[in-house]
Amino acid sequence: MESWPGVSLVGLLLLLLLGQGPSQIHGSSGENTSQPQQVFRTLKNFSFPCKPKKLELSVLSKSVHSLRPSDIKLVAAIGNLETPPAPGSGVVNMEKPQSLESELQNVCIGIMTALSDIIRHFNPSVLMPTCSPGKGTAGHTTIAEDLWIQAKELVRHLKDNPELDFEKDWKLITVLFSNTSQCHLCSSDQQKRHLMKHMEMLSGVLDYLHREVPRAFVNLVDLSEVLTMAQQHQETGFSPAPEICKCSEEITKLSKAVMQWSYQEAWEDLLASSKFNKHETFAVVFQSFFSEVELPLERPSPQDSTTLALRIWNSMMEPVGRKDGTLNEAERKTMKCPSQESPYLFTYRNSNYQARQLKPIGKFQMKEGTKFTCPDKDPSDSIPTTVHRLRPADIKVIGAMGDSLTAGNGAGSSPGNVLDVLTQYRGLSWSVGGDETIETVTTLANILREFNPSLKGFSVGTGKENTPRASFNQAVAGAKSDGLAAQAKKLVSLMKDDKTINFQEDWKIITVFIGGNDLCGSCNNLARFSPQTFTDNIKTALDILHAEVPRAFVNMVSVIEITPLRELFNEPKVSCPRMILRSLCPCVLNLGENSAELAQLVERNRQYQEETGKLIESGRYDTRDDFTVVLQPMFENVVMPRTLEGLPDSSFFAPDCFHFNVKTHARSAIALWKNMLEPVGRKTRHQNFEIKVPIMCPNQTSPFLSTTKNSNLGHGTSMSCEEKAPSASPPTSVHTLRPADIQVVAALGDSVTAGNGISSQEGDLADVTTQYRGLSYSAGGDKFLENVTTLPNILREFNGNLTGYSVGTGDVNSASAFLNQAVPGAKAENLASQVQTLIQKMKNDTRVNFHQDWKVITVMIGASDLCDFCKDSNRYSAANFSDHLRNALDILHKEVPRALVNLVDFMNPSIIRQVFLKNPDKCPVNQTSVLCNCVLTPGEDSHELARLEAFTKSYQSSMLQLVESGRYDTREDFSVVLQPFLFNIRLPILENGNPDTSFFAPDCILLSQKFHTQLARALWANMLEPLGKKMDTLDPKELIALACPTKDKPFLRTFRNSNYTYPIKPAIENWGSDFLCTEQSPSSKVPTSVHELRPSDIKVVAAMGDFLTTATGARPSESSSLDTPWRGLSWSIGGDGTLETHTTLPNILKKFNPSILGFSTGTLENTAGLNVAEEGARAQDMPAQAQALVKKMKSTPTINIQEDWKLITLLIGNNDLCLYCEDPENYSTREYVKYIQHALDIFYEELPRVFINVVEVMELSGLLHDQGGKCAMPLAVQKNCSCLKRSQNLMAMQELKKVNGNLQSALSELSYWHRYMQREDFAVTVQPFFRNTFVPLDERGGLDLTFFSEDCFHFSVRGHAEMAIALWNNMLEPVGKKTTSNNFTYNRTKLKCPSPENPFLYTVRNSQILLDKAKENSNTLYWAVPVAAVGGLVVGILGMMLWRTVRLVQ
């Protein structure tokens, strides 16, 4: 073992036995000169931190109370450090071997030289130091005589020194003495007697110096503990000092710290009031040298004499009354400097020292009682046999183990009475004290006595653990965890021997609280106080209790968060005995702010708590039904109480500012009691002593002391439902479905339902890819409900033959996945595929009777869509999300009999954001932010974040609208129910305000088993709650009771058995759209290429075509005639209103360029703008319309025909199809294309800078279905339209369908014609959204006539809006990847947006389509019949067009 740094321990001991004769270091002092220079290197390698020049003054100080280091001319020392004589003898043997005298001389000179070297930095002319140790060869002499001789020798030497002006020069004299009997560590009375004895011994010497030496600053230095330490740690060859002052009390760490402080205070009080400090030229200051109460086991190798010199110097730099006095590792190598404000050596006067009166900051209380109001105080009807059904009144015995906080040290001490901290007020102890009653003294024992007045084992009054009044409070002051096993053995022995209790039958509460002292000493011995060792010590003690004590409930209180103690210690306005604090807890209070050592301590504190928790959670102490250990974590996060002024409130502490005051004991008792009633997993982990809370009461719902098993907050759940029977016969209606009727369970969704990362351990990021399907909240079936809470495990409590659930781990294709068909990362667009697979599995698996078994299918989707929405906001729009979800549910509705579908909302992405942002250390930001970039990367208050929130709300709204449409309530054996428990979700928060990452997988995105458990409980609760009253908020940390069906309400709830009426949607006021695009800027300069054309570059808009472009009948209710052309509402050219009220292509473009020209308004010809369409137009009219349009453009003065970019939309062919039956040759596909080509040629020759939309004609097959009598077909159509005359002729209808397809196919080739690709500023792009046109259906699946005007022929405003949206979206889709169908569903957010990556309108070239196709078709067209369409546009539309055409022709 290495020795402590500084003077060698042999040397120190020799120093303490100083030899004879004054000695001064001079260059001519013979052999005595060279030897010390060889032995002591003093401050040669020491970095001097002070800046003397800043403190220099030219005038020498006249007062000792303003004495600066630069004023000192000489350093000297005298002393006697021998053991005091035996009582009554008055003498000490001073004889020492001659060989030691030389070494003693060297040690003394070395220390004085080091001190002199320090002063030399301030005053280079300081003289060589002087040592005047005792004679040692004069035989027997008293200590007083020896000191007298030294003093006289010193004075003589000073007077004879020619370099010293004895009268004017300032001298620094150090008087060394010892108190090696350690009487200063005894009780106050003994200490005072011994102190007076020493004072008498030294008074003569000090009086002599005071009288004889002018201008002197005298240090009175007690090196008692330095000597004791030397004797304890190194063999010196000398006999240890005899114990001549045996203390009446045992010396403990606490008593030693208190007595050290008291000893120093006594010396300072004596000296401050003495005559030695009443003059201007002389002062005596006491400098104590106390060692740390616990020294490090390993210390640096011995250094030179600088250590002791530095300590003397540093003490001189500290104001009297604020000297800490202890030697500690942190200060052994540091030097303090005079400050600008206090550049002098500190005396009692310039320190403003007053006799210490320690007063607490805050209001002191001698006692603190609490009002007890719990109504239910009865015990169990019979003595319980299980600890998990233990009521407070069942407790008959109480006990405790721990340290001084449980022993009650200082709990009842009055303010300022530091010595009384040694008194153990066990009757006031928070966990086991039993003084008085709850009304005056609040303790756990007194709380329990309100339930059972016959409680035994509590401690009363004061005394140590071995006194009768301590009873079963076996806490030992100063104890560490390695002493806990001995306490456990003693407690067991006491209980067994106590005749007043029944050891075998009585229920016992034992509270264990330990660890503060371990932390306080941990930096000095990391092996002894490591977290693992600490936990092992606790385990040893708990093992003893577990093995020996029947019927016991053990509170294992987490070690307290100890660093807040620093706030009290570091606040100068708070009066605390800091020397005691540093002695008791050096490893907390001796560390620098923001130091690595402090960070290590904080981490060690946390590990103590964490490892203790793991020990308890291991289940090691839950193997017997009559014994458990419960972790009570209320001290894990402690807030320092503060006064109204914001200062640390010392009234909560004993006079030593370390132990608890009675007020804190009271509030700790209430906190412990609250913890005991709180469920495991939901216990308070935060303690604010400032707040006095009432005593919590058990209730009928939770009457028992909480254990792991009765808390229902592990991953398992207890089921206490009584109504578990199935229906008398299998129900035929989903509205009379009981839980026990469910025979099959299945699930669809993404990573959450697939179970990714559910059981992954913290930090194991790679394991997140593991799919723990058996633990999935909606589909998992691992183990049983008491171990794993999932929906299937709940349903298995009702029907043990349930099938379909997944077990273990594996992907979607594994056998263990069964009917859990969720796929990690799946999006809404993948849902239909999952549905198809699920249906096929259910049909093919023999365990499932597809037609007879009742099924619960849970669907959860959307989170993955939001993770990627910003990458392609068009693809992941709310409209598309709704469409995909509807398609999947439609398949289930159509294909699956006897099914109840749970549609579960996705978790709001803001939760994931908060977890990431507030836990950057725990969450792997760099690795996983890529997986959910659109959620995790937007800045706070950014536009991107606002868009995320808007998309989230739109997704949720679309789910609600879809279900409440009633679309899935048309069959008696099928229903979709929205389970909204995730609609509003609260972030699980720890007591310190940080998100609780234990609810999440290691990636902080997916959910842990803890969260899945809560999801399962919440889903089950929702399934039993009626519509309109379902829980729509989830706090993962709250206790969710497992609901039960009842006799009155035995069914899983649907809209019908909830007597719920879906809310009637408010009438839609307009068919406008919301504009969410952010990329709106035009090109930096006007583009010269049509392939780099942005929407904002468009200056002119125009259109040509037939009645669809004139918008005839779009708003017939506002006109007396159905023939009115509402050009201002036309899909491709109308400009009435704004986009928010009317969705048209120009209104969309106005968002990019408000100055756009050419759009139509109103109904009059003169406001048609550049809309040249005619109602009855056919393809043959297109060249004429093209000429008219060119003429209009050229004659419009506001249009720059050469520079402005123009957008022309052409749609024709409806009337051609109508007349094809009469004249197939003239209305052939070839003729149709020829006329359109001619019109395009005109534009090609006449107009620069043009982008032309050629829209394919509508797909018109599958017509003439029944319309329910709402749109009876006029007889004129049937009589005059040759096509429809043969509508019953299958061959004729096939021919019509073929021609329709040929027209579309022919137009589709136009985009690739070589002719139209020769100019850089000209492009023709075919927009195919009408190729496959779905019949518009309402929310219940019926024909939706709101798309048409009252004649069921013309498009209504809504129909035009849908066409405008479809056209715009086609324009932003690459050629070859354009949407070829129109989705007639209402959503205000269906408009796509250009993006920074793809800002241009798409042409063949910028779509990266190979130009070979265009070259192939430059001269020859190849016709192809398109694939048969999905369905017709609307019933009767072709007939009406034919009728209309005939009428016009006639």
Curated annotation (Swiss-Prot):
Recorded catalytic activity of this chain's protein: a 1,2-diacyl-sn-glycero-3-phosphocholine + H2O = a 1-acyl-sn-glycero-3-phosphocholine + a fatty acid + H(+); a 1-O-alkyl-2-acyl-sn-glycero-3-phosphocholine + H2O = a 1-O-alkyl-sn-glycero-3-phosphocholine + a fatty acid + H(+); a 1-acyl-sn-glycero-3-phosphocholine + H2O = sn-glycerol 3-phosphocholine + a fatty acid + H(+); a triacylglycerol + H2O = a diacylglycerol + a fatty acid + H(+)
SUPFAM superfamilies: SGNH hydrolase
Residues at the catalytic site: 404, 518, 659
Modification after translation, per record: Undergoes proteolytic cleavage in the ileum.
Enzyme Commission number, as recorded: 3.1.1.5, 3.1.1.4, 3.1.1.3
Pfam families: Lipase_GDSL
GO molecular function: calcium-independent phospholipase A2 activity; lysophospholipase activity; phospholipase A2 activity; retinyl-palmitate esterase activity; triacylglycerol lipase activity
Example of a GO biological process term: positive regulation of acrosome reaction
EC top class named in words: hydrolase
Gene3D superfamilies documented for this protein: SGNH hydrolase
Result when mutating residue 665 to A: Impairs PLA2, lysophospholipase and lipase activities
Residue runs in coiled coils: none
Protein name per the record: Phospholipase B1, membrane-associated
